[in-house]
Amino acid sequence: MNASHPAVHPVGVPPAVAGQLPPRMRMKEIQGMPGTIGGLLLRLGQFCFALVAFSIMVSIENFSTVTAFCYLVAATVLQCLWSLALAIIDGYALLVKRSLRNSLLVSLLVVGDGVTATLTFAAACASAGITVLIGNDLRQCKENHCARYETATALAFLSWFMVSLSFILTFWLLATR
């Protein structure tokens, strides 16, 4: 008899039953998703851009007289807190080699990224509108700090772009589960 017996020749994977699909392979981790180095870099970029935008806006003495600029400050503070917390989680996951593929956690990340992206984008757009009004329409850049307003607004847009990338990648991860 030429048949192999499991006790003599162990088989690592049981043979496929007729009509049964082979087990699905997990796709390799795409950089930028939670728990990857790319994801950590995106979170750190979001944090840095939002922090610098916040710092520039707060350094202007009369920013609080314009509601859109106050909104930008509030949105960048929220973005800083969210991005820093998730950068710490990503860094910890990388250090202990844990996957952040839990569907409840991924759902929370999608909602949080979506909310912070929307708030940051709205604040950056409002600030850009006021900056254009002050600089181009009213031509009052001599009395105001147009260059600093523009820089803070541009950095808020960069932070929004990076959180949007995180949102898209995390949403894709959630949708392909």
From Swiss-Prot:
Extracellular side of membrane: 58-68, 125-153
Annotated compartments: Cell membrane
Source superkingdom: Eukaryota
Record has Cytoplasm as a keyword: no
Topology term for the membrane: Multi-pass membrane protein
Ranges in the topological domain labelled Cytoplasmic: 1-36, 90-103, 175-177
List of glycosylated residues: N62
GO CC terms, sorted: plasma membrane
Record field: transmembrane: 37-57, 69-89, 104-124, 154-174
A Pfam entry, by short name: CASP_dom
Main subcellular location: membrane
Keywords: Cell membrane, Glycoprotein, Membrane, Transmembrane, Transmembrane helix
Description of how the protein assembles with itself and partners: Homodimer and heterodimers.
Family to which this protein belongs: Belongs to the Casparian strip membrane proteins (CASP) family.
Protein name listed in UniProt: CASP-like protein 5A2
Lineage: Eukaryota, Viridiplantae, Streptophyta, Embryophyta, Tracheophyta
